[in-house]
């Protein structure tokens, strides 16, 4: 068994497609890994307490819990809509406060944390490994805890427990307050996996510093090891070369994307790019990926129609070899090569109506997690298709044209 953790969103608003990219990327990776029997235990978090949530609750005259539950539910709904397999654990910070307090207590007991005016800070000066994840010039880089700069012993020290009476708070041995963001993730990993080191830590590229750096150093303090064997960072989605973000108001909400382009278009988009490099999108690129997604769905349905009609036995050994090849590409994040392989099979299928190619395509689309692949072609669909072919052969074009439109609506042609 291997262990993977992927940082989740801060649930203060509806997620946009930039928020969905990391979880979609690792969904594809895990589908490949699981197929070749490399089993991962997958932990994903939801940051459901944060200054942004408190601010939103105040503006809308709601509680922090009402805001976080609303947008947590929305995010979980989007996982389903985008056909993303649910992680083994989805943990909310607010469900784990006592555990996080205990974790901070361990760091204080170890001498890695110090207390100032009721807040607890991590002492980065004790660990020369600090900076090893980001490789940044720490003399020029601060972590952004400006509210605490007059309390910290060192500019790079970060808050483990924040003393405050603003928003939702909890009692701790040090003060009334709430945990720091950087300690929430490392505490969850330590608690759920109970391992000194996990195999993969994933998330957006913007989390390298300070978040991943600060997660990592806490694990080094407690266990003497880097938190993860591999740190994998997913590139941003940009709108016409500008980072997509709520603050810039240049984002596409996850549900709006589905309404305009379809859920499988997003999976197609991710498969057409490198996982670690930024994607710059615009209307033309999204429409192009929508066409590719539609082509894949039509191909899937036509391949199923052929399989339903055929009495020939399928070559299951060759199909299995093909799927193992695709799975290994997924596991290695070589997504663009998968599109090349799919298009080769589509070309073969279309040129000679090849049954083996049809079977490979059907199973491949299922492996890749396209939502359309969960919908089977029915006998009624096959009857409609065969009727269209008969009418077309008999040159009853008025009838065949009408049937063609029905088939097209069902994405069978």
From Swiss-Prot:
Which subcellular locations apply to this protein?
Cytoplasm
Which chemical reaction does it catalyze? tRNA(Cys) + L-cysteine + ATP = L-cysteinyl-tRNA(Cys) + AMP + diphosphate
Q: Report the protein name in the record.
A: Cysteine--tRNA ligase
Asked whether the UniProt record includes Magnesium among its keywords, one would answer no
Q: Motif 'HIGH' region located where?
A: 9-19
Q: Which cofactor does it need?
A: Zn(2+)
Location, primary (coarse class): cytoplasm
The answer on whether this UniProt entry bears the keyword Heme reads no
Q: Which UniProt keywords apply?
A: Aminoacyl-tRNA synthetase, ATP-binding, Cytoplasm, Ligase, Metal-binding, Nucleotide-binding, Protein biosynthesis, Zinc
What species is given as this protein's source?
Mycoplasma mobile (strain ATCC 43663 / 163K / NCTC 11711)
Q: How is the cofactor bound?
A: Binds 1 zinc ion per subunit.
Pfam families, per the entry: tRNA-synt_1e
**A molecular function (GO) term:** cysteine-tRNA ligase activity
Q: What is the annotated quaternary arrangement, including any partners?
A: Monomer.
Gene Ontology cellular component list: cytosol
């Amino acid at each position: 068994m291997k262990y993977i953790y992927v940082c989740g969103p801060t649930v203060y608003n509806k997620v946009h497609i930039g928020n969905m990219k990391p979880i979609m990327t690792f969904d594809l990776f895990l589908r490949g890994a699981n197929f070749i029997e490399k089993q991962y235990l997958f932990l994903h978090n939801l940051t459901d307490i944060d200054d942004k949530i408190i601010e939103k609750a105040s503006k809308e005259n709601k509680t922090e819990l009402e805001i976080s539950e609303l947008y947590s539910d929305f995010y979980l709904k989007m996982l389903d809509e985008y056909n993303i397999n649910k992680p083994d654990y989805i943990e909310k910070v607010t469900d784990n406060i006592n555990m996080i307090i205990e974790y901070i207590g361990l760091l204080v007991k170890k001498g890695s944390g110090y207390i100032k005016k009721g807040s607890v800070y991590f002492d980065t000066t004790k660990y020369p490994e600090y900076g090893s994840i980001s490789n940044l010039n720490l003399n020029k880089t601060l972590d952004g805890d400006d509210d605490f700069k007059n309390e910290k012993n060192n500019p790079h020290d970060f808050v483990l427990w924040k003393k405050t009476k603003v928003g939702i708070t909890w009692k701790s041995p040090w003060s009334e307050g709430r945990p720091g963001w950087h300690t929430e993730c490392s505490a969850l990993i330590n608690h759920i996996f109970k391992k000194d080191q996990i195999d993969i830590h994933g998330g957006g590229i913007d989390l390298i510093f300070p978040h991943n750096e600060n997660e990592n150093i806490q694990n080094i303090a407690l266990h003497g090891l880097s938190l993860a064997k591999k740190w994998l960072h997913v590139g941003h989605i940009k709108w016409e070369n500008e980072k997509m973000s709520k603050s810039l108001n240049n984002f596409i909400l996850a549900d709006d994307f589905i309404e305009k382009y379809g859920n499988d278009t997003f999976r197609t988009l991710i498969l057409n790019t490198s996982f670690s490099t930024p994607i710059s999108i615009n209307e033309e690129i999204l429409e192009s990926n929508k066409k590719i997604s539609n082509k894949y769905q039509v191909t899937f349905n036509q391949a199923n129609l052929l399989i339903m009609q055929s009495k020939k036995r399928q070559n299951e050994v060759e199909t299995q070899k093909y799927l193992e090849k695709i799975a290994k590409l997924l596991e290695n994040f070589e997504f663009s090569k998968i599109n090349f392989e799919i298009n080769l099979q589509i070309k073969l299928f279309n040129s000679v109506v090849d049954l083996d190619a049809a079977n490979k395509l059907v199973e491949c689309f299922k492996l890749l997690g396209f939502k359309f692949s969960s919908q089977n072609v029915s006998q009624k669909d096959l009857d409609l298709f065969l009727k269209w072919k008969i009418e077309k052969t008999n040159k009853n074009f008025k009838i065949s044209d009408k049937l063609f439109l029905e088939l097209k609506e069902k994405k069978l042609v």
